Curated annotation (Swiss-Prot):
InterPro entries: ELAD_HU_SF, HuD_RRM3, Hud_Sxl_RNA, Nucleotide-bd_a/b_plait_sf, RBD_domain_sf, RRM_dom. Residues 88-166, 174-257, 328-406 form the RRM domain. Its main location: cytoplasm. Residues 50-89 are annotated as: Disordered. The gene is elavl4. It comes from Danio rerio. This is ELAV-like protein 4. Gene3D superfamilies: 3.30.70.330. Interacts with smn1. GO terms for cellular component: axon; cytoplasm; dendrite; growth cone; perikaryon; protein-containing complex; ribonucleoprotein complex. PROSITE patterns: RRM. RNA-binding protein that is involved in the post-transcriptional regulation of mRNAs. Plays a role in the regulation of mRNA stability, alternative splicing and translation. Binds to AU-rich element (ARE) sequences in the 3' untranslated region (3'UTR) of target mRNAs. Mainly plays a role in neuron-specific RNA processing. Required for the maturation of motor neuron axonal branches and dendrites.
Length: 411
């Protein structure tokens, strides 16, 4: 399904001296053919991404992709590698779930000789986690791969290709959540506001429409810096300030970064309270929202503490809502009868790696029964998706989004 023409790729790479017009004339028909077969979409955008670019070097790192705390074998760069490795080792995010190891190798092998290539899979199920690593022999081939394949559209996914960075405490947890932004602020203006504090890896402004970037801003955005210290300076400088065009001060804080002490206290309080009640997915919306916020903080300790979730829950004899063998399962309620899996992909894809989606259908009509499930690889990304999409208006319906629990609707 994902077979890429080596002949075409070779032609693309040999045309570095060609003009933009010659490039488009030579390659657009083939790309359009791929689009007609469903292999690619937006061929003009792909060609644009295939044209030579100037990269930011090893620090143009990944963001919003699966973090190194996934249940998978880390790459050499994640466990600490040499400076030479940093120029040949790439991480590739947002791969289609049904892409195979062979297709992954074929795609990146068309650029140059590969030393190693790994599509990361769940150790239990063998299912792709939607990302992988490629290590080239020649640093120039790694740079070409970024220039050529970053932004390539495969099925419903736009893959992200960038240098893998060595694991270091200085670069972890540098993602910021920003709210109260002017509805007219663009992504470029958001970056301009924060760029004075350090190198920005990625940025995003949430919009109301799930079908594309044409919707109105929700006044909420995310900024990921290269280093945590830069993010800390941005919080000090901008939290509570009024940027140009803002009617009220903005809030700038780390995206889901609780302390271990607070997390353990909240977890104990939630699970050991004799008066604890679990509101259902359809009632007591405000109460459930507060409970979800506490749960989000409590379970976040998995990433930020060596204490595992299983060891914490053993203290109180409870299971973690939403946690499965393949990731974090999210319950989505109040979908319209015409909703299908593509709606869930579009909703949750921007927040991180999605393992799978499922819309529950009526056996007789094959229409959506009003709810579905999304499994995401990374806890932080799942929690951020819930925080952003719970209460989101989709058409004439307001979605209710939470981690799946034992009391959630069964299919």
């Amino acid at each position: 399904m994902f077979e890429i023409s080596r002949t075409l790729n070779a032609a693309l790479l040999s045309n570095e001296g060609s003009t933009e017009t010659q490039w488009r004339q030579a390659d657009l028909p083939q790309l359009q053919g791929w689009a007609e077969k469903g292999l690619l979409t937006q061929p003009k955008m792909i060609i644009s991404n295939m044209e030579p670019q100037v990269t930011n070097g090893p620090n143009s790192a990944t963001a919003n992709g699966p973090s190194s705390n996934s249940r998978s074998c880390p790459s050499p760069m994640q466990t600490g590698g040499s400076n030479d490795d940093s120029k040949t080792n790439l991480i590739v995010n947002y791969l289609p779930q049904n892409m195979t190891q062979e297709e992954f190798r074929s795609l990146f092998g068309s650029i140059g000789e590969i030393e190693s290539c790994k599509l990361v899979r769940d150790k239990i199920t063998g299912q792709s986690l939607g990302y992988g690593f490629v290590n080239y022999i020649d640093p120039k081939d790694a740079e070409k791969a970024i220039n050529t394949l970053n932004g390539l559209r495969l099925q419903t996914k736009t893959i992200k290709v960038s240098y893998a960075r060595p694991s270091s405490a200085s670069i972890r947890d540098a993602n910021l959540y920003v709210s109260g932004l002017p509805k007219t602020m663009t992504q470029k203006e958001l970056e301009q506001l924060f760029s004075q504090y350090g190198r920005i890896i990625t940025s995003r402004i949430l919009v109301d429409q799930v079908t594309g970037p044409t919707g109105g801003s929700r006044g909420v955005g995310f900024i990921r810096f290269d280093k945590r210290i830069e993010a800390e300076e941005a919080i000090k400088g901008l939290n509570g300030q009024k940027p140009s065009g803002a009617a009220e001060p903005i809030t700038v804080k780390f995206a889901n970064n609780p302390s271990q002490k607070t997390s353990q206290a909240l977890l104990s309080q939630l699970y050991q309270s004799p008066n604890r009640r679990y509101p259902g997915p359809l009632h007591h919306q405000a109460q459930r929202f507060r409970l979800d916020n506490l749960l989000n903080m409590a379970y976040g300790v998995k990433r930020f503490s060596p204490i595992t979730i299983d060891s914490m829950t053993s203290l109180v004899g409870m299971n973690i809502p939403g946690h499965t063998g393949t990731g974090w399962c999210i319950f989505v309620y109040n979908l319209s009868p015409d909703s299908d899996e593509s709606v869930l992909w579009q909703l949750f894809g921007p927040f991180g790696a999605v393992n799978n989606v499922k819309v529950i259908r009526d056996f007789n009509t094959n229409k959506c029964k009003g709810f579905g499930f999304v499994t995401m690889t990374n806890y932080d990304e799942a929690a951020m998706a819930i925080a952003s999409l719970n209460g989101y208006r989709l058409g004439d319906r307001v979605l209710q989004v939470s981690f799946k629990t034992n009391k959630t609707h069964k299919s």
